[in-house]
Amino acid sequence: MKLFVGLGNPGARYAGNRHNIGYMAVEAIAADHGFGPWRARFQGLTSEGRLGSEQVLLLKPETFMNLSGQSVGEAMRFYKLTPADVIVFHDELDLAPGKLRLKQGGGHAGHNGLRSIHAHVGEAYGRVRLGIGHPGHKDAVAPYVLSDFAKADQDWLADLLRGIADGAEALARGDGAKFQNAVALRMQPPKPEKPKPAAKAPEAQAPEAAPDERSALQKLADRFR
């Protein structure tokens, strides 16, 4: 079994926040792949289904972001999972909006949700880093991540979530390259068609000469006129 964790904060107040893009990612997977209904478990909401041959549990911790590790740890203990079975979807300030990167293990880079997971299960789990951009100053980070995506962000956000759902099966079986390719196909605008070369106008042909119907005697006489 694989455990896909989407980080965010519970409640309608936070639903459209940049900080909740992890929630949005696992919700897109559940909707696109016919997962079961969300139900309360492990201090969060879970939905079960299959991605290819892999049984997958989707988890949205409802502990609020800073205590996400409590929920993740509880689910892992119940199913006897290791960090290698876990992939966490989270917002990433250090990536431009719409960019996506995979990471296995390593530090939490100051992300409070990851910090909590580190404290409960260690750092060896996988992450899908979802770029939301940086507001430019550290004092602006909290209000920025706790604000809704702007209207101008909606198109790339929808494409990103569709790409994540498209590639989820590849991610579950460990094919990170194919997962990223699925996302890239959604994010890249279609290339404009090359204009077809204009058809060449047919060359004008000289009019055919009228056939000479003179008799041999007339032709001879005309030569001496």
UniProtKB/Swiss-Prot annotation:
Biased composition (Low complexity): 198-209
Family annotation (Gene3D superfamilies): Peptidyl-tRNA hydrolase
EC category name: hydrolase
UniProt catalytic activity: an N-acyl-L-alpha-aminoacyl-tRNA + H2O = an N-acyl-L-amino acid + a tRNA + H(+)
Keyword Repeat found: no
Site, as annotated: Stabilizes the basic form of H active site to accept a proton: D91
Swiss-Prot/TrEMBL GO biological process terms: protein quality control for misfolded or incompletely synthesized proteins; rescue of stalled ribosome
Record EC number: 3.1.1.29
Cited InterPro entries: Pept_tRNA_hydro, Pept_tRNA_hydro_CS, Pept_tRNA_hydro_sf
Major subcellular site: cytoplasm
Residues reported to bind tRNA: Y14, F64, N66, N112
Gene Ontology CC terms: cytoplasm
Subcellular location: Cytoplasm
Role of this protein: Hydrolyzes ribosome-free peptidyl-tRNAs (with 1 or more amino acids incorporated), which drop off the ribosome during protein synthesis, or as a result of ribosome stalling.
Subunit structure, as described in the record: Monomer.
Protein name, per record: Peptidyl-tRNA hydrolase
Organism whose genome encodes this protein: Cereibacter sphaeroides (strain ATCC 17029 / ATH 2.4.9) (Rhodobacter sphaeroides)
